[in-house]
Amino acid sequence: MESQRNLLLIGLLFVSFLLWQQWESDKAPKPATEVTAAAQIHDQAINSDVPTADAGVPATVAATQNLILVTTDQLEIQINPVGGDIVHAALLTHKLEQNEEAPFVLLEQKNNFSYIAQSGLIGRDGIDSAASGRAKFAAAADAYTLADGQDTLEVPLTLTTDAGVTFTKVFVFKRGQFDVGVDYRVANNSAAPVQVQMYGQIKQTITASESSMMMPTYRGAAFSTADVRYEKYSFDDMGKKDLEEPTLGGWVAMLQHYFVSAWVPAAADKNTLFTSVSAGGLANIGFKGSVHDVAPGATETISATFYVGPKDQAALSALSDTLNLVVDYGFLWWLAVPIHWILMFFQSLVHNWGVAIILVTLTVRGLLYPLTKAQYVSMAKMRNLQPKLQDLKDRFGDDRQKMGQAMMELYKKEKVNPMGGCLPILLQMPIFIALYWVLLESVELRHAPFMLWIQDLSVQDPYYVLPLLMGASMWAMQKMQPMAPNMDPMQQKMLQWMPMIFTVFFLWFPAGLVLYWLVGNLVAITQQKIIYASLEKKGLK
């Protein structure tokens, strides 16, 4: 019994360690990045033809007066006709605060903060080179709206050069979607071939993530290549070394809690992914596509997709089979993915995320019931063996080797596995951690209500009722399990304090996770009563 108590304590503390370690290793906020001189020189070498990280950022509000406003059922976008950059993106179906009407704004420029998406054509005949400056497009209107019954909205920006080449930058919006098609149509009406190369980049002022120990979040960049499915590239990484990754297809992104912006170039195109950081603290991640030759009299379209919205796994997977990995479940992703699927399935049935979490808990506990029963049977047998084990200790005294051999023979004779009570606990720990990351990373749970005072399962209980109930249930479970009479007094005190320690620990956990743990405890108490009643009939106490 003593060994199982110790293992329970170790298992619970192990969870705490893993969560803390995960936060410390790659989630903790980092200070503002300092850019080394070597990195700046390398940046100039890689991206000498791409507009600098500071280019295209209006210094005053007056510079943004002629922005083009685009409104769909999902997005409110502002496009600067200089370069055709997306300088503002509000997500109309995601509120900034739960009980307010103001939408969540992902891309914006205000005060000393800038977060924009830029794209253009560079190369020999490009219109957006670092040397010549950004293209100045003309638009037929200053506002576009996706009308009722309309599924697609195109916003064309046009520029014709003195040589007779017409460049049309077309933004394509679709109903119900957060991805924006960006097409460059190059109509070469000149007498000479035109050579251009598309690029896209996301620029963001370096800021620390709004993170806490119980709610660790990542704010920074990420990318994917043909060889590397998903890799984070933090602001700190950018300051130390510029990225330069040639690949077929791929994507680049800027991540934050629940939301993402990403450039997804053509999958069949040869691209170079790159990063840079300006001396002013503006981080940049982007791609450069392959060179396109447009013959005289010909027209060619060069395309990429820009996503600006929530970390919706289905929507992201539709753009790239690896883009959904920005929903980062950590090292237990292989367990978190099916848990998320089960959670989504139950929610589709009951239309309440809290009830869905309860159903997931019942499912997990039901699947683990045979192991749970085996655990309590093993614990009961171990309790019955305590007098015989004490006799062995008295007989062999300090001869640990002989006493160990005698104990193993006794276990074999009585058909008792001393480790039999550990397996259910060890299995529940990964499930707990995986569910923690599901609740932390899944945007579906943002502002998701349960009932009564729990109106957002993704944040802590505002009145701490669930953590207190969880602590009480943990105390009740502990009282139901007989304490070994020969347990060390210090260990007894530690176990007695565990419910209170974990109550404090859970005060800042998301309410959804505390709900899972509370319901799990209540189910465990019920299972204990059933199993103990069965054991008493068999003469095991």
UniProtKB/Swiss-Prot annotation:
Species for this entry: Shewanella amazonensis (strain ATCC BAA-1098 / SB2B)
HAMAP family: YidC_type1
Cell location: Cell inner membrane
Disulphide bonds in the chain: none
GO cellular component, one term: plasma membrane
The keyword Membrane is assigned to this record: yes
Protein name per the record: Membrane protein insertase YidC
Main location group: membrane
Chain ranges passing through the membrane: 6-26, 326-346, 349-369, 420-440, 457-477, 500-520
Biological process (GO), any one: protein insertion into membrane
Keyword hit for Signal: no
Keyword terms: Cell inner membrane, Cell membrane, Chaperone, Membrane, Protein transport, Transmembrane, Transmembrane helix, Transport
Pfam families assigned: 60KD_IMP, YidC_periplas
Subunit structure: Interacts with the Sec translocase complex via SecD. Specifically interacts with transmembrane segments of nascent integral membrane proteins during membrane integration.
Domain of life, source organism: Bacteria
Role this protein plays: Required for the insertion and/or proper folding and/or complex formation of integral membrane proteins into the membrane. Involved in integration of membrane proteins that insert both dependently and independently of the Sec translocase complex, as well as at least some lipoproteins. Aids folding of multispanning membrane proteins.
MF (Gene Ontology): membrane insertase activity
Entry's family note: Belongs to the OXA1/ALB3/YidC family. Type 1 subfamily.
InterPro entries for the chain: Membr_insert_YidC (IPR019998), Membr_insert_YidC_N (IPR028053), YidC/ALB3/OXA1/COX18 (IPR001708), YidC/Oxa/ALB_C (IPR028055), YidC_ALB_C (IPR047196), YidC_periplasmic_sf (IPR038221)
Membrane topology of this protein: Multi-pass membrane protein
